[in-house]
């Protein structure tokens, strides 16, 4: 039996999410249509609202509804510290630890030459300009401890150190192969407090 085109379109749309294959997408689509149409409508409205209103912060590249995000606008933050993370989810996890009071730069990815992701795709030039503004004294590399995250940290560290900046890396409280988004706040807090010079 061929499924209705509207259901097929919904299944395909759900497959854009990371880790969602055809069977999971099918289950989600059927669940929404059969058991939670109100939830489906809310999801649709929220996605539309987010795509229309979210943009990248002009300073740190995270998602925001304004030109400059709340963190970059906070005059209580230490502008001499710049923490580099891969994703907004990583930034949120670090903020939840309440151990870091500097500013951020969000790469929106990590180096992965096999996937065609190089320095341009992770906004490397913007990061270098931000870190070299004469205010930043220390750059904290908080990329994930995956192979790509380590390669990204190494590349960024070498380049930023060559510009005379102090570069530190989160300590190894975060498990090797771990991603910040999935690590508990206590572990991230310890890693931030025990960061080391590269």
UniProtKB/Swiss-Prot annotation:
Keywords carried by this UniProt record: DNA damage, DNA recombination, DNA repair, Metal-binding, Zinc, Zinc-finger
SUPFAM superfamilies, sorted: Recombination protein RecR (SSF111304)
Pfam family membership, one: Toprim_4
UniProt key word Zinc: yes
PROSITE patterns, per database record: RECR, TOPRIM
Residue ranges annotated for the Toprim domain, each copy included: 80-175
Superkingdom of origin organism: Bacteria
Zinc finger annotations (C4-type) as residue ranges: 57-72
Gene3D superfamilies: 3.40.1360.10, 6.10.250.240, RecR Domain 1
Family: Belongs to the RecR family.
Name this polypeptide is given: Recombination protein RecR
Organism per entry: Burkholderia cenocepacia (strain HI2424)
Gene: recR
